[in-house]
Amino acid sequence: LIKHVDALIVIPNQNLITNEMRLTMKQSYAIADEVLKTDVIAIAEIITRHDEINVDFADVTTILKGAGRAHIAIGHGEGKDKVQDIINQVISSDLLETSIKGARRLIVNVTMSEDLLISDMDELTAAIADAADDNVEIIFGNGTNPDTKDAMDVTVIAADFVDRDDVP
């Protein structure tokens, strides 16, 4: 399949089988479907929203064109530990068995409350950049949500990994 697409995100069904979660087949498919739906909605929102710094379809194409395996993660944080919570959510995904380690292309799209400190944004972007390849190209999007307080939502799309033979 990867030979016929620009980018591929895989949800290994084996990761839905754990001792802690006793899922029926229907429940496991619903979880995989929900992850896929959430990711598609996140990409659609990135493309269609008009934020302070926009990410458009051309930007998504730039990141994903000919990229091979890809990683997508969505993080949410509120309050004092919001940045660290988000970093933990977007750097890697246990379910997808992927991370941004070695990514040479990233989209980082942030929606934040209007009271967010610039130091929070700096901490977030530095941690994401540090986790990727040293020469990573980052397309950054940013908007505000006036209905939230002390909160951030972040979508990260990572692609074009240094070692394409490994799962990112």
Features from the language model and the residues they span:
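Tubulin/FtsZ superfamily GTPase core signature
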Residues: I2-P168
